[in-house]
Structures are given as C-alpha cells and as structure tokens.
C-alpha cells in the first residue's frame, strides 16, 4: 500500500498531506482542542468540556505508552516525504485526530450541528490517517491501530462519564437525550 501512495504522489497532494500533518499535529491540534474546551466551558457545558479534554489527552497518553511498549520502527525513511522522530506503532496523528473527531461527534451529535460535525469529524480523522501513509511515515496498520484504539478509548470514556455526568448525554446547548 505504501508503494501505491509513493507511486501516486504529486506536489499538490504532498502539500495537502503536509498541511494535514501540521494541523493534526502536536502544535496545532491541542490548541484547537483547548479552544473548543474553553468554548464549551464558557457555554456551561462543563461535562462536555471535560470529556473532550480527557478524550484527546487520554488518547495521547495511551499512544505514548503503547509506542514505548511496541517500539516499532518507522517505514524506510529514504522513501518517506517527512522525517518523523520516534516509533511508528500506533500512529499518534491518527490516534489523536480520531479521538478528536469521535469526541466532537459524540458531543455535538444531539445538537443542530450533529450531522455536519459527525461528517467533518469522520472525514478529518480519515484524511489525517491517509496522509500519514501517503507521507510514508506510518504503515497502514499503525494508522488503523491508532484509530481503533481511539474508538475504544473515547466511546468507553463517554459511556463511563455518562454514568457520573448525565448532562454529557445531552447536547452542549442543554437538550437531553432520553433514549
């Protein structure tokens, strides 16, 4: 699969993939997350703010620990567009951005923005994951493991927090889901 991406690289797609790497990386995604957390908190949706912070922060911590356990080397750096430090498995970009996308989907699902946010969250997570393979810095299994780990983490966190903070099941605007 990495060979297919390598064979189909173009300057335009490479610029897009590099932009996704920056926006979804450790310097920008935390700022986006913090801005949304602050907005939710100011709007009185404190359970939602806490959930988003724990979802993305917890996925990041889980990623660091998992990388230290597996210590999988990255794909051949001579074939990669970017040089990334550290281990490959699981993809930190895929994990953090999947956690972000899943969390904002769960937060806004019951609001008017539900479907658009769900679609944007899913598309964003997929694009960041694909970009990691396109850039040659991760194997497909790294990206898949990162996304699936975040799915389990974020949904598990949502179910657990929903038991102790029932307001999390409603929209940030205060509507409640009684299903």
List PLM regions with ranges.
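Hydrophobic alpha-helical transmembrane segments of polytopic
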Residues: 25, 29-36, 56, 117, ...
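Membrane-interface helix caps of multi-pass small-molecule transporters
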Residues: 4, 64-65, 159
